[in-house]
Amino acid sequence: MDHAQRERSMRAHWKENRTFQRSIENREGQQTYVFYEGPPTANGMPHAGHALGRTIKDFVARYKTMSGYQVLRKAGWDTHGLPVELEVEKQLNIRGKDDIEKFGVERFIEKCKESVFVYENEWKEFTDKLGYWVDMEDPYKTLNNPYIESVWNILATIHDEDLLYKGHRVVPYCPNCETSLSSHEVAQGYKDVTDLSVTAKFRIKNKENEYILGWTTTPWTLPGNVALAVNPEMTYVKAKQGEEIYVVAKSLANTVLGEAYEVVEEVSGEDLVGINYEAPFDFISLDNGHYVIGADFVTDTSGTGIVHLNPAHGEDDYNAIQAKGMDFVNVVDSKGRYEDVIAPLAGQFVKDSDVDIIKMLAKDGTLYEKQKYEHSYPHCWRCDTPLLYYAMEGWFIKTTAVKERMQENNQSVEWFPNHMRDGRFGNFLDNMVDWNIGRNRYWGTPLNVWVCDDCDKQKSPHSIQELRAFADSDVPEDIELHKPYVDKITFDCECGGKMHRTKEVIDVWFDSGSMPFAQYHHPFENDELFNKQFPADVVIEGVDQTRGWFYSLLAVSTLFTGKTPYKRVLSLGHILDEHGRKMSKSKGNALSPVELIEEFGADALRWALLADSSPWNNKRFSKKTVSQAKSKVIDTILNVYSFYSMYADIDKFNVAEHATDAKTTLDSWILSRLNSVIKEVTTSLDQYDITKGARSIALFVDELSNWYVRRSRQRFWSSGMNEDKKAAFTTLHEVLSKLTQLMAPYIPFVADDIYTNLQGDSVHVSDFPKVDEAAIDEKLEADMQGVLEVIEGARSLRNEVNIKTKQPLAELVVVPNDEQLQSGLQAYTSIIEEEINVKQVSFKKDTADFLDTEMKLNFPVAGPKLGKQVGQAKGKVENFTEQEKEAFLVNGTINVELQDGSEVTLEKEDIIVEKKGQEGYQLFEGNRFVLLLDTNLTEKLKEEGFVREFIRAVQTYRKELDLPVEQRVDIYVNSDENAERILSEFDALIHDGLIINSVQFAEKEDMKQVTVNDTEMGLSIV
């Protein structure tokens, strides 16, 4: 089967046998491991980042299940918010709130409901194909009444504690979406941009040529200037430059004015407070404004030390103006455009107006300087529009009141990577502000606060039942908790007035942050289930969720219960393309996970995501990464299983009938390695180091395939069911069974296919393998590791001189660094001889008899020191006697007499030492040994090499004919006399290497023509 057939077959098998459900039911009564699914939005297609997140979530859940825990996995859908509204606006070809109102809010809401599940089937199919086991039949949905009712209960509880309030503040605002954003939403949308900063001239009233220099990075705010701020504690100067006098901070004078100025007077900031000035523009007139005030937020780290204040677009500006009782003005509308009062720019988007503002300043003579500067600026995380800071009324949750508790809760959380706790996430908590919870939009959980039209009294119902109790008329039985339906419900106020619901819906992050409670409709039902499922043992999402879901979970839980909602967090890195760039459709470098699954299989995709680098690191990812995962790991384990199953079928091996305790050294070694790997992997996975575990497994798969199975082939090929063959079958059966259990969380399809064929039931209802300490033989593993290293080194020597392994060589000389290594290698000399195809492996104490040592002057180091003598020294070094070479190697220094009679001392760094094998010997220098391979070829060695190449040619031809591996055949050869002579002399070797009856020299019809070491011959197999 190819991967697509296998995975399709396994999915059907799991469904038919209820394997996912059984894996949970089998753990009933066991300790619970609590898993939370961060809800995706189903109005967009899944991307590579989703594949990473879902793979790691599935991995952890499978591993913990196999480790004995019951892991409930409830899926979820995030259904509210701006992304849905924007998608619907596109579908309807409308834009903005005015168009929505014209279209009809109720109709718009119905369209939103339809939109949120447009790609639900694609998400389900993707989830299924990826092998992510999560309960998608009973997911929580943030749009459902029970979910919203639980969210209302949390909000009402917060309101009861006076932590939910209405205020007028400067908040981040998206002019495209026409709504404010919370600080954690803002943190997700920063981009590096180039903008213009301006130093403007504010003329002091009643002074002909005296100006205060005010600096701003937002020139578009200058038409709404109300005040200038100085720091009363700072020193300022009045500096004459040309015919004009400028006021600027003393410490910034050189930076702002350059050197061509004269200080007329030094003044304190306090002295400047109260000075009246003329604003650069005269579009607005103020009753109380356009004078200098003192503010401690003004610094001398940049600008002029004097800050222009526009209370509508800066939090510090707003607070300072409010504190002084100065006029509040706003000349920008809700769409981010200048109002008519700014006549030259009316209707123009303010962020596009900086150049026009600067031109107007220059024309009026009030521009001192303009500069380009690069900085990070917040953009809407949903529509990509540059945000404005905008003074408006809104609803806020006083998260600052529970800041310390949130910080304490965070300290109890185990973060992966650890630095996130006190770094990125901890810093965000340190700088948190009250949560701007209200959104002036349509599709979302309605904020459940009713306000009296007359006395401003507020009521917040905890439930639908309370909503009915408060309402002044009957509430429909099927009331839907969305706009515009709940907006029709009014309350009677004690003062005699009417209470209407405030117009806002809530931040969608509060929706998803409430999921620990709302997914089970807490506190209205499922108390026992909720108590078992809170807090989470782990939450897993991308690193950007430090300012998203991770934050909202912690904030909501701390506000509502005082407790942390999770014990540990796995914060995943980004998926990048092979060049290290972020993937995006617009760049054309995005990879579709569904297409990767179709091309390479889900197991290959999963292995590539899990084994390449730690989950919290950014990953460079490409088709090649997935292709290599398939070829190096998935295909290798399948080939090992195919080898086992083919010969087990031929020999009718039955583990229950034929199993034996007998073992060869090779069997003991692979079982020792298996248990060492089980130990390593278990330790890694218990520490959530999934990648380290994968690397241990990958190494073992290679050892199993390229060492154990390859070295054991003759045992499986032997006739009959002897004890040695039983031992090989028994060992490989055990290794494959436990290896597939180890690999099941990584590659669930292949692992289950193999395990089910071996054991009769799914690997996913089995236990993760336990280490058998008694099976671990550290000395045997160390000895065999030495053997493998020697073989690898010797093979590299063959490659250097282009001599194939089929060509036997006379000798491999090994010079080990220590006696223990030599002892281990000597025990397996015959294995090394077979693998390297040498007649003899010999051990020496040193390399003196096999190496030539060459020395030459190190010109970059010795040249400057020797000067004109460098030429003489070069000749001397290159002609050192063996005694001189030995003396230098021992002492690390040598005195050299030059031709002119002078003497120089050469140190270790002055001479380059190169060691080479003597002619006919190839040198390999490893960390623990030196190898010397005799590459001289005698005629007898060449003849044997010819025979081995002949054997390879016959094996290749057998495969082409698709002959059963166990079928014995007769071989007919038609070649020259010399070839026939050689083949006859090595008849025993040919019979050892092939399953044949005989080799006969005769011409047959339709013989296959092959070339063996430049000799042409015809082959026929019958």
Curated annotation (Swiss-Prot):
Keywords noted in UniProt: Aminoacyl-tRNA synthetase, ATP-binding, Cytoplasm, Ligase, Metal-binding, Nucleotide-binding, Protein biosynthesis, Zinc
Catalyses which reaction(s): tRNA(Ile) + L-isoleucine + ATP = L-isoleucyl-tRNA(Ile) + AMP + diphosphate
GO CC annotation terms, alphabetical: cytoplasm
Swiss-Prot/TrEMBL cofactor(s): Zn(2+)
One of the GO BP terms on file: isoleucyl-tRNA aminoacylation
Subunit-structure text: Monomer.
Primary role: Catalyzes the attachment of isoleucine to tRNA(Ile). As IleRS can inadvertently accommodate and process structurally similar amino acids such as valine, to avoid such errors it has two additional distinct tRNA(Ile)-dependent editing activities. One activity is designated as 'pretransfer' editing and involves the hydrolysis of activated Val-AMP. The other activity is designated 'posttransfer' editing and involves deacylation of mischarged Val-tRNA(Ile).
Record-given protein name: Isoleucine--tRNA ligase 2
